[in-house]
From Swiss-Prot:
Gene of this entry: pgi
Location in or out of the cell: Cytoplasm
Protein known as: Glucose-6-phosphate isomerase
Record GO terms (molecular function): carbohydrate derivative binding; glucose-6-phosphate isomerase activity; monosaccharide binding
Pathway: Carbohydrate biosynthesis; gluconeogenesis; Carbohydrate degradation; glycolysis; D-glyceraldehyde 3-phosphate and glycerone phosphate from D-glucose: step 2/4
Catalysed conversion reaction: alpha-D-glucose 6-phosphate = beta-D-fructose 6-phosphate
Family note: Belongs to the GPI family.
Matching Pfam families: PGI (PF00342)
Enzyme class per UniProt: isomerase
Chief place where the protein resides: cytoplasm
Domain of life: Bacteria
Length: 545
């Protein structure tokens, strides 16, 4: 456990020594701070100079990582050891993008051979749709693709397809359906022509309630309009491991793409779950996405901790969570294409590390994953940055931006990028009472009025942030960015001694929903309901009589 590691008391002592120090003083005394706390990897760079740390902090954090045998645990994951201890599974999302030739054997299975076999089938299918060779039941080309999934079967593909829209096939439109609220599926179907629509149903078991409900609604809509169930074979494909259920649905087994239990949903966009990505962007761009992630994997495995991006970000996060007692972390991308990135990271981070039980089954006496949230930074400035600047919470921020200007939008990117740098500087530097008072006097306010108002114009500063810069939003850079956050999450899970690869927390609500659904549908359930739940069930039933 973290609190039992030999470096932990050293970090506690160090925290007491520097907790009142201000970053603006460090910057004024150390002209090399920005260059020393800057790491470049391929087309991605991290400026972590605006954090409440110094060389001693970093030295102790790296020592903490070594106390946890982080290097050995990284190697264990890549080798396919069953580090998902509660489910007795390997964790091999990295194998999905591996360019190595050294085979990984898992329970007599050749992992890379299996992965590449599925990728080959995905490429052939993608090519057939993009080229127009695969036609619908009236011999029309496919123009619209609807991905039906939820959680990891939705968020990753949605995020990547949105981020890389500039690389998409000009004929194809992507639609994502995840919410079991019928409004979403009906709104999507309303726009579509069944003769030119391809549905991808993504569910490992092919029994996920939300996904199957939406898929059956899509199936009913399609059959009613096409006039014959046999046409399903040309318009529905599945990403699943349940061949029998897929065939019962009407999908040809040759149009089923498998994935494996060594890949968790939130880590699965690199697998057949990414079929929608490959069709939309093409195999060349999908390969570049995989390669970018692979290069980050190699960096994570091989770079020393001192220049290792996932290690640095993971340890800096631990520093705030476990010593500054920060409860929250903000993801602020300054790019319209990255608008779904915060909610993707929400799932990745909170579903992985939102745990309170150690790998040994003991209750953990310290904080783990913070609440992760975010929005596009430029919009957020006009919404909740007020709280970040002058509120009572310490909320570390990841600013994410690209250097590449958008064509045909002169001046826009300079304004956008200036705000990234200005906000990060403002959070670090702040504004003193004396500065605020002087500004108000210079604007002509009376001295007494300026004295009172100046209190409201003070920015304490010392608010930490990372700045992640991509040269441009490209397939390879997106691959590297996602893999960076995957590995950051892994680092923190190791430090906290938790299993980052199960998600038992999603199960209880699903179990309890079963008897409630029976009651709502007019069937009697033997389940016991608390008085509040019972009252609300009756309220619903009475309204819908």
């Amino acid at each position: 456990m973290l609190t039992q590691l030999k470096t932990y008391p050293k970090l506690l002592k160090h925290y007491e020594e520097i907790k009142e120090m201000h970053m603006r003083d460090w910057f004024s005394k150390d002209k090399e701070r920005a260059s020393r706390y800057f790491v470049q990897f391929e087309s991605l760079s991290l400026d972590y100079s605006k954090n409440r740390l110094n060389d001693t902090t970093l030295k102790l954090l790296f020592e903490l990582a070594r106390d946890c045998s982080l290097k050995e645990k990284i190697e264990a994951m890549f080798k396919g050891e069953k580090i998902n201890t509660t489910e007795k599974r390997a964790v091999l999302h990295t194998a999905l993008r591996s360019l190595n030739d050294t085979e990984i054997l898992l329970d007599n299975m050749e992992v890379l051979k299996s992965v590449r076999s599925v990728l080959k089938r995905m490429r052939a299918f993608s090519d057939s749709v993009r080229s127009g060779k695969r036609l619908g039941y009236t011999n029309q080309v496919i123009t619209d693709i609807v991905n039906i999934g939820i959680g990891g079967s939705d968020l990753g593909a949605l995020m990547v397809c949105t981020a890389l829209k500039r690389y998409a096939h000009p004929r194809l439109k992507m639609h994502f359906v995840s919410n079991v609220d019928g409004t979403q599926i009906l709104d999507v179907l309303e726009k579509l022509n069944p003769a030119s629509t391809l549905f991808i149903v993504a569910s490992k078991t092919f029994s996920t309630q939300e996904t199957l409900t939406n898929a059956l609604t899509a199936r009913k809509w399609f059959v009613e309009r096409s006039g014959d169930e046999k046409h399903i074979a040309k318009h529905f494909v599945a990403v699943s491991t349940n061949k029998e259920a897929v065939q019962q649905f009407g999908i040809d087994e040759h149009n089923m793409f498998e994935f494996w239990d060594f890949v968790g949903g939130r880590y699965s966009l690199w697998s057949a779950i990414g079929l929608s990505i490959m069709i939309y962007l093409g195999k060349k761009n999908f390969n570049a996405l995989l390669k970018g992630a692979y290069l980050m994997d190699e960096h994570f495995k091989n770079a020393p901790f001192e220049s290792n991006l996932p290690v640095l970000m993971g340890l800096i996060g631990v520093w705030y969570i476990n010593f500054f007692k920060s409860k929250s972390h903000l993801i602020a991308p300054y790019d319209q294409y990255l608008r779904h990135f915060p909610k993707f990271i929400q799932q990745l981070d909170m579903e992985s590390n939102g745990k309170r039980i150690s790998k040994k089954g003991e209750t953990i006496p310290y904080d783990t994953c913070p609440v992760v949230w975010g929005d596009m930074g430029i919009n957020a400035q006009h919404a909740f940055f007020q709280l970040l600047h002058q509120g009572t919470h310490l909320i570390p921020i990841d600013f994410i931006a690209s250097l590449d200007k958008k064509p045909n939008a002169k001046g826009h990117h300079e304004i956008l990028f200036s705000n990234v740098l200005a906000q990060a500087q403002a959070f670090m530097k702040g504004k003193s009472y004396e500065e605020a008072f002087g500004e108000l006097l210079s604007k002509g306010l009376e001295k007494d009025e300026a004295k009172d108002l100046a209190h409201h114009r003070v920015f304490f500063g010392n608010r930490p942030s990372n700045i992640l810069l991509l040269e441009k939003i490209s397939p390879s850079n997106m691959g590297a960015l996602v893999a960076l956050y995957e590995h950051k999450v892994f680092v923190q899970g190791v430090i906290w001694d938790i299993n980052s690869f199960d998600q038992w927390g999603v199960e209880l609500g699903k179990e309890l929903a079963v008897p409630i659904l029976q009651e709502l549908e007019g069937h009697k359930s033997n389940a016991f309901f608390d008085s509040s739940t019972k009252h609300l069930i009756e309220l619903y039933k009475n309204y819908n009589q």
